[in-house]
């Protein structure tokens, strides 16, 4: 009887496993951005962000306080498998995904 319960439990667990991968791909990024160029002038102000090519769905460069710059991938980490799952705006240090309405403090 114990063997039957054990086999049923293992079978149910094996059947219920989801094979869908729900993770962000690992992508090597090696970018150099010259912040003194005119196309990046809007990032000179603290609290501003720009979007550039690279990564999985693009790259966000965020200018924090002083000389603090942070870089993030634009792929939303809440539901990364959705095709619309992209950070589309950054306001006051909060990144927003228009697809799943997630907000991330950056």
Regions found by a protein language model. Name each.
Residues 95-97:
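Compact Cys/His-rich metal-coordination microdomains
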Residues 18-92, 103-106:
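N-terminal pre-ligand scaffold of iron-sulfur
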Residues 13-16:
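C-terminal motif of bacterial Sec signal peptides marking the signal peptidase cleavage site
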Residues 2-7:
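Sec-dependent signal peptide recognition
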